[in-house]
Regions:
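Acidic, contiguous N-terminal accessory segments
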Residues: 1-84, 116-123
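Short hydrophobic-aromatic micro-motifs
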Residues: 58, 92-96, 393
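A Trp-anchored, charged/polar loop motif used as the substrate-binding/catalytic surface
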Residues: 285-290, 424-428
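Extracellular/periplasmic catalytic domains that process cell-envelope and extracellular macromolecules
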Residues: 49-51, 85-87, 128-129, 297-298, ...
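Structured, solvent-exposed acidic/aromatic patches
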Residues: 319, 324, 328-334, 340-343, ...
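Substrate-binding groove of N-acetylhexosamine-processing glycoside hydrolases
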Residues: 296, 339-778
């Protein structure tokens, strides 16, 4: 008898009386999927008895596990598992060790086992690959791409549970813009749209009335709704906040002695922004009250991730504050050396973490605080020994201080990478540092990214299954059990063939999987037996191109959107374009009025993003190694799409069509990034030229680049108008500096016009652009 037949014959579904919402969720979904109107009954432990026609769905605590042992059910000796059993009475059991693995097991049942013989899945027991897979900085659910059009939050959260994730962040602003007030000409207030602080959801006795009640209520409502959905599917809800974040000056005017550190960026911000001094007991009580209020609303909150020293947040007297070490009056007196200040600053950081951990633990005893270490390079030596129980870190590497990159690009060993899919290995030495923290019950959540963020933002659904697998395998080989996936997953209704995250799901359910076999089976499911090999071949070509690409600083991370690369003109002298004609993109660009990035793509504020030599190396290697496999992939997908359509194989035609348009979009992205590298090199080379021939060569490079970029814009417009799939993140409401909107094609037309009008201008850079001053009296 097949599993589907047994399910239709189920007369009663039994779940624990004192259980989890996910058990009831699964019971209802399962009965609905097999058109069975059986009753769902809640029973206590004594009711878990094998009976014909019964189906048990449960998370198994130790007490219940002992009882089930007597039913003849076998369990893993490990802590993390899921099982599907049919016993001698044809009683079915869907069980897991943790609530967040139960839904994964359920989807395995309905997606893979329905047509199997019951005897073949008599006792399916699977140990889980990673104890924790935490979502961090989820673009779509909580962060700056939450405006994405037609977003189905429940379907998205359900997909997390299906994939085998365990923890997700749930705090997001309900409005498109934060409450933070800015100053004309600066770019700073917008940064408060992501990782919203505790005071965006609740008020304390200290800051009552600072934010409008309706603003806090709407944010809290969204947080609670996200948390409810997380719990519905068995996930642990938590928070990601920039803290201690700046507060409105009106609060500091009322309590001037509570002024803490200046935490803004003096180039990007046109007014000083200060937070509260967390060394003061009143401020500590304020933070405790905020967190406890939130947890009374959502007692199941399991963690709070704290990012800091950026985006209007920072810890007092830490070295990486943008204006340098500074803070309130209570930590250390003046004229102390750097080491003494670092020691006190580290103690203050840990005290804050422990304060919040203990506050959260009053309601949820397992509550954890998680932070990043990069920002604390000046305090790391003092901070590390103080990391303690349930004070965790999330990292790209435990071996470095600050933002150093020590991992080689998978194809180019001379290029160092950090954080993206290109960081596909893990050094043996990471294990020792991780084990040291584990011995204190302090976890290390290692970053990885198989979505668009840090890889191909704003594109959706770009496949690189082998790179994805290699990082997971590296984690497993080093004994890593806790992960943090950066950037969110692909929304399932927009990316029906989310190859990379499917690899994660398969690995989570089978850490010893064979990647070639896994990719082949996935292709078989998507395209059918006749076309599976061809689909794998297309993926292989796309990944070959991805591996051959060289990242370009923030442009390969988020800068295509933030710096508006897709829609800003790449011309020899950007400064020659009148400001009024540049406004269509500069008004939504992450930049202040005097940022040299407005006219020089190699710079951002005082950073040298991409040097001339690196830019030359990048576009040379891209031209040599990327285009052949990527063009082959595009042609391959188109050919197979047309062939499948011609014989009426709709299933295969759809997947080849989907991959064809995504590969074309990837080519457009890579061309713009490549052309950005050419611009950086050629404009500087022209200015540096000591003889006419060098200048002439640079000029020719620029001319060819502009031809390519104009053609690329037209290709993007064609993609926009013709593609039946959602290949790019697009806002459903307004354009912001972090997301494009429905006017994307119109902006590309404006770019083309400006490039055609200014392509003959002489290459030029003003090294003093940032010193320009309107109404300069001199």
């Amino acid at each position: 008898m097949k599993v589907s037949e047994v399910l239709r014959q189920v007369r009663q579904v039994r779940i624990p009386k004192k259980g989890f919402p996910v058990e009831e969720t699964i019971a209802k979904e399962l009965l609905g999927s097999c058109d069975n109107r059986a009753d769902v009954i809640k029973v206590d432990d004594s009711g878990f008895v094998s009976e014909e026609g019964a189906l048990y769905i449960a998370v198994v605590p130790k007490g219940l596990r002992a009882r089930l042992d007597h039913q003849g059910l076998a369990f893993s000796s490990q802590d993390d598992w899921v099982s599907i059993n049919s016993d001698v009475n044809q009683c079915l059991w869907l069980l897991s060790s943790k609530p967040y693995f139960l839904y994964t097991g359920f989807t395995q049942l309905i997606e893979n086992f329905l047509d199997e013989e019951v005897s073949d899945v008599l006792s399916w027991m699977q140990e889980i690959g990673f104890s924790v897979e935490k979502s961090t900085f989820d673009l779509f659910l909580t962060q700056y791409a939450r405006l994405i059009r037609d977003f189905d939050r429940e379907k998205y959260i359900r997909e997390y549970a299906r994939l085998g994730f365990t923890h997700i962040e749930v705090n997001a602003l309900a409005s498109s813009l934060p409450w933070e007030k800015g100053v004309p000409g600066e770019f700073y207030a917008d940064f408060y749209t992501y990782c919203p602080a505790l005071d965006q959801f609740a008020s304390s006795r200290l800051n009552q009335g600072i934010y409008p009640a309706e603003y806090l209520e709407s944010n809290l409502k969204l947080l609670k709704d996200n948390a409810r959905l997380a719990l519905k599917y068995g996930l642990v809800p938590g928070l990601l906040c920039f803290e201690p974040r700046s507060v409105p000056e009106t609060l500091l005017e009322k309590y001037p002695t509570l002024r803490g550190a200046r935490v803004d960026h003096p180039f990007r911000s046109f007014k000083p922004r200060y937070n509260l001094s967390i060394a003061h007991p009143v401020v500590q009580k304020h933070y405790q009250e905020l967190l406890i209020k939130l947890m009374k609303e959502v007692p199941e909150l399991g963690f709070m991730t704290i990012w800091s020293n950026d985006s209007g947040a920072g810890f007092e007297h830490t070295k990486s504050l943008y204006v340098g070490r500074n803070g309130g009056a209570f930590m250390i007196r003046e004229w102390k050396d750097d080491e003494a200040i670092a020691k006190v600053a580290a103690a203050n950081i840990i005290r804050f973490f422990v304060l919040l951990r203990d506050a959260g633990s009053r309601i949820n005893p397992g509550f954890r605080i998680i932070t990043r270490l990069e920002s604390f390079y000046g305090e790391r030596d003092h901070l590390w020994p103080q990391l303690e129980e349930r004070v965790d870190v999330e990292v790209n590497s435990l071996l470095v201080k600050g933002w150093e990159s020590i991992y080689p690009h998978p194809r180019y060993p001379d290029v160092k990478v950090v954080g993206s899919a290109y960081q596909n290995t893990l050094m043996d030495k990471e294990r020792g540092a991780m084990n040291e923290l584990n011995s204190r019950n302090s976890r290390s959540y290692f970053y990885h990214a198989f979505g668009c963020h840090t890889n191909h933002e704003p594109l959706l659904g770009i496949p690189f299954p082998w790179l994805t697998f290699e990082k997971l395998q590296a984690f497993a080989e080093q004994g890593v059990r806790t992960l943090a996936h950066v950037g969110g997953i692909h929304p399932p209704d927009k990316v029906p063939y989310a190859v990379n995250q499917e690899i994660f799901r398969l690995f989570q359910l089978n850490p010893s999987l064979d990647i070639e076999e896994a990719v082949q089976k996935m292709a078989l499911r998507y395209a059918g037996r006749t076309n599976a090999d061809d689909l794998v071949e297309g993926w292989r070509l796309v990944e070959q191109a991805i591996r051959a690409f060289i990242p370009l600083s923030i442009y390969s991370h988020y800068g295509v959107v933030w710096q508006r690369l897709f829609v800003r003109p790449l011309v020899p002298d950007i400064d020659r374009i009148p400001e009024s004609e540049r406004a269509y993109y500069e008004s939504h660009m992450c930049t202040s009025i005097h940022n040299p990035n407005k006219v020089d793509l190699s710079k951002d504020v005082l950073f040298d993003l991409v040097t001339k030599d690196y830019a030359h190396m990048a576009f040379s290697r891209i031209d040599e190694n990327v285009w052949a496999p990527l063009e082959s992939a595009i042609c391959h997908f188109k050919k197979k799409k047309d062939e499948a359509a011609s014989i009426g194989d709709q299933k295969a035609a759809l997947v080849f069509e989907d991959q064809y348009f995504r590969a074309r979009a990837l080519k457009c992205l890579y061309i713009t990034l490549r052309n950005t590298a050419v611009w950086i090199y050629a404009v500087q080379e022209y200015q540096d030229a000591g003889d006419p021939s060098a200048g002439s060569t640079a000029r020719k490079l620029l001319d060819k680049m502009m031809e390519k970029e104009i053609r690329n814009c037209r290709e993007l417009i064609e993609l926009w108008n013709e593609s039946p799939i959602e290949w790019m993140i697009i806002s459903g409401t307004e354009e912001t500096p972090f997301i494009h909107a429905a006017n994307f094609a119109e902006l590309l037309e404006k770019k083309i016009t400006l490039m055609e009008n200014h392509r003959k201008d002489e290459p030029s850079l003003d090294p003093d652009y940032m010193f320009r001053l309107k109404n300069n009296p001199y």
